[in-house]
Amino acid sequence: MKRLEDYRGIVSDEIIADLHRRASKLHDKHVVHMNSTAQGGGVAEMLYALVPLMNDVGVDAGWRVLVGSDDFFGITKKFHNGLQGDPVNLTDNKKRLYIQANESFSQYNHISKHDAVIIHDPQPLPIIRFYKKRQPWIWRCHIDLTAPDPGLWE
């Protein structure tokens, strides 16, 4: 597991000190990241490093991985491609399955003690609908949104 000190020599002592200084503003905060896979993707690789580094500088960070059926992940792959410009035809049934998977995930994934939620990519995006607490939510999109299929924004 990486620690910030492992980067000493790659980045300057001033940068490491600056990261600690900036993180001190969040020392009493709980942050949770949500994405759709624990392995095999760029977001997962990033979170494997980022979450321990956040904890190392004193930010209480966690990570939740969305659970869904093969059909759900097939639909979210269409979302992914559509957000990058491919034309997508999502039936009402596919939209319902997408929403239902997020609702189901929300029922056993308790985030009420977190001060901020960071959603990575579109798979868990509608999950905010199913929580009563309205702490800050951040959508960190890791895909190109230059020319998305306009129908996906509906």
How should each PLM-predicted stretch be described?
Residues M1-E154:
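Catalytic cores of nucleotide-sugar-dependent glycosyltransferases that transfer UDP/GDP/TDP-activated
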